[in-house]
From Swiss-Prot:
The lineage of its organism: Eukaryota, Metazoa, Chordata, Craniata, Vertebrata. It is found in: Mitochondrion membrane. This is NADH-ubiquinone oxidoreductase chain 4. Core subunit of the mitochondrial membrane respiratory chain NADH dehydrogenase (Complex I) that is believed to belong to the minimal assembly required for catalysis. Complex I functions in the transfer of electrons from NADH to the respiratory chain. The immediate electron acceptor for the enzyme is believed to be ubiquinone. The chain crosses the membrane at residues 20-42, 61-81, 93-113, 114-134, 148-168, 195-215, 225-245, 258-278, 285-304, 308-330, 351-371, 394-414. Its EC number is 7.1.1.2. InterPro entries: NADH4_N (IPR000260), NADH_Q_OxRdtase_chainM/4 (IPR010227), NADH_UbQ_OxRdtase (IPR003918), ND/Mrp_TM (IPR001750). Pfam families: Oxidored_q5_N (PF01059), Proton_antipo_M (PF00361). GO terms for biological process: ATP synthesis coupled electron transport; electron transport coupled proton transport. Belongs to the complex I subunit 4 family. One of its GO terms (molecular function) is NADH dehydrogenase (ubiquinone) activity. Its main location: mitochondrion. It catalyses: a ubiquinone + NADH + 5 H(+)(in) = a ubiquinol + NAD(+) + 4 H(+)(out).
Length: 460
């Protein structure tokens, strides 16, 4: 664990002491090294339990894929941000990269924590850098409103969780995940216990976000700079799913009945947010709502609490993290050239950027779950689980997948096909940096098809 954590912490002096000329090169190289070292976690010494462990930090089959995704994303965020942060003063550039690196440190400690209180503290600590990135480097003044929404939604959900955790500590005497899995299941039957159950899960459902408490997400995504959108879509939403899976172990007797309304809400949300996507004119807003739709499926898979549901949820979280991050990068490259996120003003780009149209095509097909890709594997596992629970859910999930295909193709056709407007014919060509960025996003998605056990979690 420390093999990754110590180099990540050493990024901070590197960022502040490197000469301005080499700042971006050094940080990108350093973070790529960290990402390659993190791949070692995939080599589990024991197939089932915790590995790389000390008293407070450990990895297991559930957290490993998410940890590697976190480390993989930092060099990509630094690569994506170069163009629009470069004109700023050097101290601000350093601060920006410092915030990204601190976010990675918090996330590694959140996914690696074995103590639930430590997970909670890191879960909350990720708010601070994200909030600064959104409110300081966002595009329009609306970013302050988005930051407020983001902060208050997440904090309002998290405070009951803290109280619930303290109550759990009082009743079981420990909050270590290593011990809790062997402790006696709690006898939960009163109203107070039901409120306690809700308090444990609401924080994660807000973070995912579940339809109904998702209003902060489109605002935050649309206003954030590209690195903010990438880390929000790829890793921060996954904190919610990860936390739910960890808490479900302790909430076992109650969860069977109380989860029903949340499952229905998640499935209804897939259709509702998908329908909202079909009406969007703003490119980033469309990708943000599609994230809500996918995470609704993940929430359903986790709340069912079967091995297939958990596996499907992890697979879909990893695949969605890479793909939606890639889509935000593509949206940003178009925005940097046309200075507009409105799809009608920047259409027909395929004629000008043919290779980029290929990236758009692959990313969109991955988003709508094309057969060999892991997105489909995750969706099929979750849909099968839900169908086993109640055959009626096939109506909702089937309609949801249909709408997903619809808005993905709509996004591709609106941005790439059609006549090219006269005002965007003189755009600068794509850089190698951007092609590298897309390669590093989409190659892992394609490679995961060949060895999907890496993200099957406990089932494997």
């Amino acid at each position: 664990m420390l093999k990754v954590l110590i180099p990540t912490i050493m990024l901070f002096p590197t960022i502040w002491l490197t000469s301005p000329k080499w700042l971006w090169t050094t940080t990108t190289a350093h973070s790529l090294l960290i990402a390659s070292i993190s791949l070692m976690w995939f080599k589990w010494t024991s197939e089932t339990g915790w590995t790389s462990s000390n008293t407070y930090l450990a990895t297991d089959p559930l957290s490993t894929p998410l940890l590697v995704l976190t480390c993989w994303l930092l060099p990509l965020m630094i690569l994506a941000s170069q163009n629009h942060i470069n004109p700023e003063p050097i101290s601000r550039q350093r601060l920006y990269i410092t915030l990204l690196a601190s976010l990675q440190t918090f996330l590694i400690m959140a996914f690696g924590a074995t103590e639930i209180i430590m997970f909670y503290i890191m879960f909350e600590a990720t708010l601070i850098p994200t909030l600064i990135i959104i409110t300081r480097w966002g595009n329009q003044t609306e970013r302050l409103n988005a930051g407020t929404y983001f902060l208050f939604y997440t904090l309002a959900g998290s405070l009951p969780l803290l109280v619930a955790l303290l109550l759990l500590q009082q009743s079981t005497g420990t909050l270590s995940m290593l011990v809790l899995q062997y402790s006696q299941p709690l006898q939960l039957n009163s109203w107070g216990h039901m409120i306690w159950w809700a308090a444990c899960l609401i924080a994660f459902l807000v973070k995912m976000p579940l339809y109904g408490v998702h209003l902060w997400l489109p605002k935050a995504h649309v206003e954030a700079p590209v690195a903010g959108s990438m880390v929000l879509a790829a890793v921060l939403l996954k904190l919610g799913g990860y936390g739910m899976m960890r808490m479900m172990v302790m909430l076992d007797p109650l969860s069977k009945e109380l989860a029903y309304p949340f499952i229905i809400l998640a499935l209804w949300g897939i259709i509702m947010t998908g329908s909202i996507c079909l009406r969007q004119t703003d490119l980033k807003s469309l990708i943000a709502y599609s994230s809500v739709s996918h995470m609704g499926l993940v929430a359903g898979g986790i709340l069912i609490q079967t091995p297939w549901g958990f596996s499907g949820a992890i697979i879909l979280m990893i695949a969605h993290g890479l793909v939606s991050s890639a889509l935000f990068c593509l949206a940003n490259t178009a925005y940097e050239r046309t200075h507009s996120r409105t799809m009608i003003l920047a259409r027909g780009l395929q004629i000008i950027f043919p290779l980029t149209a290929v990236w758009w095509f692959i990313a969109n097909l991955a988003n709508l779950a094309l057969p060999p890709l892991p997105n489909l594997m995750g969706e099929l596992m979750i849909i099968t689980t839900l169908f086993n629970w109640s055959p009626w859910t096939i109506l909702l999930t089937g309609l949801g997948t249909l709408i997903t295909a619809g808005y993905s193709l709509y996004m591709f056709l609106m941005s790439q096909r059609g006549p090219t407007p006269n005002h965007i014919t003189g755009l600068q060509p794509f850089h190698t940096r951007e092609h590298l960025l897309m390669t590093l996003h989409l190659i892992p998605v394609i490679l995961l098809v060949t060895k999907p056990e890496l993200m099957w979690g406990w089932c494997y």
